[in-house]
Amino acid sequence: MDKRRCSTTRRAVVIGTLVLPAAAFAQDAAPRPAGAASLAPVVVTATRAEAAPFDIPASIDRIGSETIRDGRAQVNISESVGGVPGLLARDRQNYAQDVQISVRGFGARSTFGIRGVRLYVDGIPATFPDGQGQISNVDLGSTDRIEVLRGPFSALYGNSSGGVIQVFSEEPATRPTVDFSIAGGSDGVVRLGAKASGTAAGLGYVVAASHFRTDGYRDHSAAERTIGNAKLKFGNDTGGSITVIVNSLNLPRAQDPLGLTRAQFGSDPRGVDASALQFDTRKNVDQTQVGLIYDQRIDAANALRLLIYTGHRNTTQFQSIPVATQAGPLHPGGVIALSSDYRGTDLRWTNRGRVAEQPYTLVAGLAYDTLEQRRVGYQNFVGTTLGVQGALRRDELDTASDFDPYAQATVQLSTRWSVSAGVRRSHVRFDSVDHYIVGTNGNDSGSARYAATLPVIGALFALDEHVHLYATAGRGFETPTLNELAYSPNGATGLNFALRPAKSDNLELGVKTRSADLGDATLALFETRTQQEIVTLTNAGGRSTFQNAGATRRRGVEAAWSATYAQNLRAQIALTYLDAIYRDSFLTCNITPCPAASAQRVAAGNRIPGVARGSAYASLAWAPVFGWRGAVDARRTGMVPVNDTNSDATPRSIVVGANVGYVGRFDGWQLSGFVRGDNVLAKRYAGSVIVNEGNGRFFEPAPGRTWLLGTSASYAF
């Protein structure tokens, strides 16, 4: 084939990758990060072996530090990952709850925290063994990159891996460097940051701290948060290194405005339900963790990596459960106090070599994680005084642990073909010891064991150096979390050990292209079929119970394109279409116990709530190293059902943001400043939803037009 014809073929593939899905997304269509220039040597590690995303048979995106920090508040991860296709990240404007994250529909049902998606910060799991996670302890001011892995290969991370999000701190600078930043804006938002980095006498260090506070967009939504993060790196003369990571989070008080009903959302989106004020709904969190990573190269072909970590997290949450509802002897109260001790290890061996003259990479390892959680419940009143800690109503020690051996390999079969395969054997154990045995509230101790074998295989074909095709298939599983096990149906006490894990079969087909003229593009088609999906059974009195209910299907298309022109002009487009439905019908209820007459049938074919069928993202940025810079971005999100019965949904929304700034040098200092506007068209929309909220308060409003002004200064000695 002559060069002209080959070039024409490549251009047709690239343009087809963009145009065909764009037509399919005319109704609703989500995003990927603005990265470095096309053909830049970008490397990711989400598959446990360093490789370029272009050479991996999986959907994977890398968000760099410039995207994370340029013109941003650096408060929530949702600011940075909005451009990743298949990933829906929502800022709930409620710091008593974590950012709402779902990947290809996994995690969408979570009413608080993050579930269905595995989270890691500097290699340390931010997801507990039960599958429940949080990511509020990330200091974005010292973050180097975020990697997002979607599709079948996520299962190699074990339980609850509908997707994998990994956050990595900066590596130590070669010269001592200090950095200071401040940003402030609408609704009393203020963020202060400081960082020191350098290398001296064989020790590399990055030490950072940030403080954030806000009055909140809505009434009763003020919050304050302080994060500290330190990364220390020691090298030795034998090809090894030790990295110590220390992280702390302090959230002394975050008011919880709760959700709003459709009527409340329409009349006063900044308002709050009266019950939030009556009971002073709020949350506080205190967390400290430390991890150690030991990397040792044995020889040219073999390396070992050992991770050890431990941490402690205290959480206290005051809810708005009415006094009368807590009258029953089996009710656990309206205050939840959790004291969590967690620890774990991951030992990994990597071998690189050649077989039949073809290169291969083999990774084998063993992961163990454990959580001990003391769950105590209290009444949220004393006499006629509401919103205070009252009488003890629950006291138990819950433990969850996993023990997972895993192995994966990539073999280059020829100059064009490569095959990647892996397997993980996941064992998850739950135990509960009841310490509150009073009257008719008997001993509710119990245990459960879950296990699954999770195979994955993928193949990649290099059509030429600019176009790669791939296909991947795998199996995943998702156990119930401790929060989903916490309450038994029909008012019974004890954990709901009748719940079983959901099991999924995943398939993905994709094409990746890169061109110096046309930029980088990806297109992925995927389908996930799940059996024994965990869904809501009842939701009443501030408590949700769950059940296994038949089958679901998640089918969709993701497309992304990015390019850099004239070195500094960066353009990006990302699209997602996701059809997530229940394949089987089931019953749900808004009262406990749930008599048959009160049950509502969720019809087969209903959409899974919390998931937009389509979303689209586009951005254009002028980003020279020094001088004036600016960017504009737009995001369109389709309607989002709020419950399993699909009785209501958020309206479609289009949100536009823009920022302009300047970067310069002055007497050895690098100085920068910016101003940013979000929702500059002042659209009214729901930024997130509380799925299956029992009182009909589904809607969490997003702010109107907001402004942010920020500046930073750094100096390298």
Report each predicted region and the residues it spans.
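Transmembrane beta-barrel wall of Gram-negative outer-membrane proteins
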Residues: 177, 184-213, 218-256, 281-303, ...
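Gram-negative outer-membrane beta-barrel transporters
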Residues: 349-350, 419, 522-529, 547-643, ...
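Conserved C-terminal beta-signal and adjacent last beta-strands/turns
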Residues: 14-15, 197, 235, 247, ...
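Surface-exposed extracellular loop regions of Gram-negative outer-membrane beta-barrel proteins
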Residues: 252-267, 372-379, 427-438, 447, ...
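N-terminal Sec signal peptide and the immediately downstream disordered periplasmic leader
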Residues: 1-74, 78-82, 234-235, 716
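Face-selective signature of the C-terminal outer-membrane beta-barrel domain
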Residues: 239-247, 284-437, 462, 519-525, ...
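Membrane-embedded beta-barrel scaffold of Gram-negative outer-membrane proteins
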Residues: 293-295, 303-321, 462, 468-474, ...
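Short acidic/polar hinge/loop motifs at secondary-structure boundaries
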Residues: 116-117, 124-150
